[in-house]
Regions:
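Surface-exposed loop/turn elements that mediate protein-protein interactions on large endomembrane-trafficking
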Residues: 39-52, 74-87, 106-122, 143-158, ...
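Bacterial N-terminal signal peptides
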Residues: 5-16
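Beta-strand-rich domains and repeat architectures in extracellular enzymes and scaffolds
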Residues: 20-64
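Short beta-strand elements that form the blades of beta-propeller/WD-repeat-like
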Residues: 26-33, 66-71, 97-103, 133-140, ...
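Recognizes the extracellular SEMA beta-propeller fold with strongest preference
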Residues: 93-96, 102-104, 112-113
Length: 234
């Protein structure tokens, strides 16, 4: 646990020092590799490094500029501790120092704060794909849409056919052969077939898992880019 806490502190810092070279390496975020190992991503755009495994047996993880949460089989782990949770993976919607969490195996929503979970009485219809405060991306028989906890519709995403990630002020989603980043009234598309998952890697990047590799998608407006990550791809 101590090693994990130190790693989280490093990820939240502005820079890391790469001990072997003495070079300051900016922290990008975290990914879960094909073995279920949590690994830090460091470097600069187009030149990334995957750090050593910090935790094994990870089913899900998400990071923002303030918070990283990890789901093992039966716990949610943070930089400050851990709490018991339903078995299986989790979908995280991070907001400041809190998060909304969805547990697919029991179809239950909860609010995470200070290493405790409060069950929510949300009864959202359809397959939950992503969460942000008070909004949920779901797949239903008529397609993918964003809804409120009472199931009222906010917006349809007619182009989406694969994974979806709700951002604070936008959305990333997959079509059959593209990744679409939509925010600030604009849209950027990248070629990417066979997308399996889209997760929050850090404050400025999301992780795209597709056909045996992981990409880092930079989401900063005006600097949108898609980069292939090195190393242990799924």
């Amino acid at each position: 646990m101590r090693r994990l806490l130190l790693l989280f502190c490093g990820v939240c810092a502005a820079v890391h020092t790469w001990a072997q070279s003495g070079i300051e390496v900016p922290a990008i975020g975290m990914i879960v590799d094909s073995s279920g190992d949590l690994r830090p991503v460091q470097g600069v755009a187009g030149s990334f490094l995957l750090g050593p495994t910090s935790m094994s047996g990870v089913l899900s993880a998400a990071c923002s500029d303030q918070l990283c949460l990890i789901k093992t089989d039966s716990k949610i782990v943070s930089a400050t501790g851990e709490t018991d949770a339903p078995t299986g993976p989790a979908i995280f919607g991070l907001s400041g120092d809190e998060a909304i969490v969805f547990f697919p195996e029991v179809h239950t929503f909860a609010r995470w704060h200070n290493d405790s979970l409060e069950t929510l009485d949300w009864a959202v219809e359809g397959d939950v794909l992503s969460i942000r405060p008070k909004e949920i991306a779901v797949r239903r028989h008529d397609g993918i849409s964003i809804v409120r906890p009472d199931n009222s519709a906010i917006e349809f995403i007619p182009d989406a056919s694969g994974p979806v990630l709700l951002l604070a002020k936008g959305v990333v989603f997959a079509t059959k052969d593209q990744i679409v980043l939509r925010q600030d009234g604009g849209e950027v598309r990248f070629a990417s077939a066979g997308t399996q998952s889209i997760t929050a890697m850090g404050a400025h990047y999301v992780a795209i898992r597709a056909r045996g590799v992981i990409y880092a998608l930079r989401i900063d407006p005006g600097r949108e880019s898609l980069f292939l990550l090195p190393g242990n791809a799924p």
